[in-house]
Curated annotation (Swiss-Prot):
HAMAP family reported in the protein's UniProt record: NhaB
Principal location listed in the UniProt entry: membrane
Protein name as catalogued: Na(+)/H(+) antiporter NhaB
Transmembrane segments: 28-50, 68-88, 98-118, 121-141, 145-165, 205-225, 244-264, 311-331, 350-370, 394-414, 449-469, 477-497
Similarity annotation: Belongs to the NhaB Na(+)/H(+) (TC 2.A.34) antiporter family.
Pfam families registered for this protein in UniProt: NhaB
Domain of life where this protein originates: Bacteria
This protein's UniProt keywords: Antiport, Cell inner membrane, Cell membrane, Ion transport, Membrane, Sodium, Sodium transport, Transmembrane, Transmembrane helix, Transport
Entry's Gene Ontology cellular component terms: plasma membrane
Annotated membrane topology: Multi-pass membrane protein
Gene transcribed to yield this protein: nhaB
Reaction equation(s) it catalyzes: 2 Na(+)(in) + 3 H(+)(out) = 2 Na(+)(out) + 3 H(+)(in)
Notes on how activity is controlled: Inhibited by amiloride.
pH dependence: Optimum pH is 7.5-8.5. Activity decreases sharply below pH 7.0 and is null at pH 6.5.
Length: 500
């Protein structure tokens, strides 16, 4: 019989993850040294990449930082990569780490302004089709200049706040009472139909907004973390990045917005739910109450946030400094002029992005393994051996398929580095490199909406507090994203193959 201490170790290992998942990760850790001894470093490295992708695909079972971190720690100990190679990767991609550390935190301090904007939109527009289009378009516009993760966080905050307000009223609970919005036990039968319709309404808006972040995020240097990686390798600043990607991103944006309208009109794939009149009345009363509470100090803070947003956009457009440093500027401006000087208040802004920043370091460790073992060199050589006109389309497909099951930052890092090495070795012209860089950028951004694993914003939505409240499961997200995946992936491939 096992001792209480050994049982405690077993329970503590990877926390609340399922037992089968814990055993799988342990099996990986035991298999890798044996495989290195029997099959050599290249085979072991390929298996490690597959194991790491598995941890990304199982992100709902356990955040990938812990199992992925254990795998790369073992890889470093086994000599599949060196700590120096990992450090070199981190130095090379330091602008991306700056982006995640400071830009996401900077936008956190604009949340009040963004919450007000989305709240006014939700209650001010009565046509569900128009509302969905505006949510998608606004998310796209914001994601082009801000961080897609933060835009998604704002939309989630609006949805959680409004759901909690109506759920409390439907449950008959007073505002002063503690209650759990995750359970419907106290909701009478009379209100349940409205509650389910409201859930479907919020689900569709959340998905439209999440897709909007992908539509806008692909367009600019700061829209997604991998864009900055690609732009850094290609030497593109903000305006140049937009110009290079526009032949693909602009038609796909238009097609995505049209898809949004058609889905709401057809009421297919889980879209088309309306906001019940009774729910609208409750939410309108809540919004009016919040507006009455807003004093001169709060209004001044909103004005500061709006001015900081303007500084942010101008700073990005003119590339006055690295993106992350502009984010730090936003933090300083907003906190200084809104009176946020408490260390703990400021610290909350960094909670959202730092786990993902740590995970990105683990990504780069896997990339270091790939580089040191030359795993992707044969694949890139096979693509480059194709006729030049077929290479962008094939890279788009290769990136898209892998991005749908893995994280697109990870995929983009691998491919853009390999293609840059081919350019440096004189295997292609600069013009052709630019075309392939666009193919990699769009290939990792557009088809990756197929599953929550591909887009960080989608994964954030799925693992957020709103997902269980509105019954947004992994399978439902895949189903609701399917029409967008087909349109964005199909048109993106055509544009990359024929319009670049």
């Amino acid at each position: 019989m096992s001792s209480p201490l050994s049982q405690a170790f077993a329970q503590n290992f990877l926390g609340h993850s399922p037992r089968w998942y814990k055993l799988t990760v342990l099996a990986f850790l035991l298999l890798n040294p044996l495989l290195l001894w029997l099959a050599g470093p290249v085979t072991s490295a390929w298996v490690l990449v597959g194991e790491f992708i598995f941890t990304l695909a199982m992100a709902l079972k356990c955040y990938p930082l812990q199992p992925g971190g254990l795998l790369v720690l073992e890889a470093l100990l086994l000599g599949l990569a060196t700590p120096e190679a990992l450090y070199a990767e981190l130095q090379h991609n330091f602008p991306v780490l700056l982006l995640l550390m400071f830009m996401v935190a900077g936008i956190y301090f604009m949340k009040d302004l963004l919450l007000l904007l989305f709240s006014r939109l939700l209650l001010g527009v009565r046509s569900k089709t128009l509302l969905s289009l505006l949510f998608c378009l606004l998310a796209a516009l914001l994601s082009a200049f801000l961080d897609a993760l933060t835009v998604t966080a704002v939309v989630i905050s609006v949805a959680v706040a409004f759901f909690a307000v109506y759920h409390r009223v439907a449950s008959g609970q007073r505002a002063s009472e503690d209650y759990d919005p995750a359970t419907d036990r106290q909701v009478p039968e009379l209100h349940r139909a409205h509650l389910e319709e409201f859930r479907a309404f919020l689900r569709s808006l959340l998905m439209h907004a999440a897709v909007g972040t992908a539509l806008g995020g692909v367009c600019t240097l700061v829209g997604e973390p991998q864009n900055l990686l690609i732009g850094h390798e290609a030497g593109w600043h903000f305006v140049e990045f937009f110009r290079q990607v526009a032949p693909v991103s602009m038609p796909v944006l238009a097609a995505g917005l049209l898809t949004c309208v058609l889905l709401e009109k057809s009421r297919r794939f889980g879209y088309g739910a309306q906001l019940p009149a009774a729910v609208r009345q409750v939410l309108a009363e809540y919004a009016a109450s919040e507006s009455r509470k807003r004093g001169a100090q709060q209004k001044a803070a909103l004005l500061v946030q709006a001015l900081a947003a303007l500084v942010l956009i101008v700073g990005l457009a003119l590339h006055v400094a690295e993106v992350g440093l502009i984010g730090l500027l936003v933090i300083v401006l907003i906190t200084a002029f809104t009176g946020v000087t408490d260390e703990h208040q400021i610290g909350r802004a960094f909670q959202e992005a730092l786990p993902f920043t740590a995970l990105l370091v683990v990504f780069f460790a896997v990339v270091a393994v790939i580089h040191q073992q030359h795993l992707f060199t044969p694949i890139i050589q096979a693509v480059l051996a194709l006729p030049a006109e077929r290479q962008p389309g094939m890279l788009f497909i290769a990136n898209g398929l892998l991005s749908a099951i893995s994280d697109n930052v990870f995929v983009a890092t691998i491919y853009i580095t390999e293609v840059k090495q081919a350019l440096d070795a004189g295997h292609m012209s600069r013009e052709h490199f630019d075309t392939l860089a666009v193919a990699i950028n769009t290939g990792t951004n557009l088809p990756s909406v197929a599953t929550p694993n591909g887009q960080a914003a989608f994964l954030f939505l799925l693992t957020s507090s709103i997902a269980p409240l509105v019954r947004l499961s992994y399978g439902r997200m895949v189903w609701m994203a399917l029409p967008y995946t087909l349109v964005m992936g199909g048109l993106g491939w055509w544009a990359v193959s024929h319009w670049l």
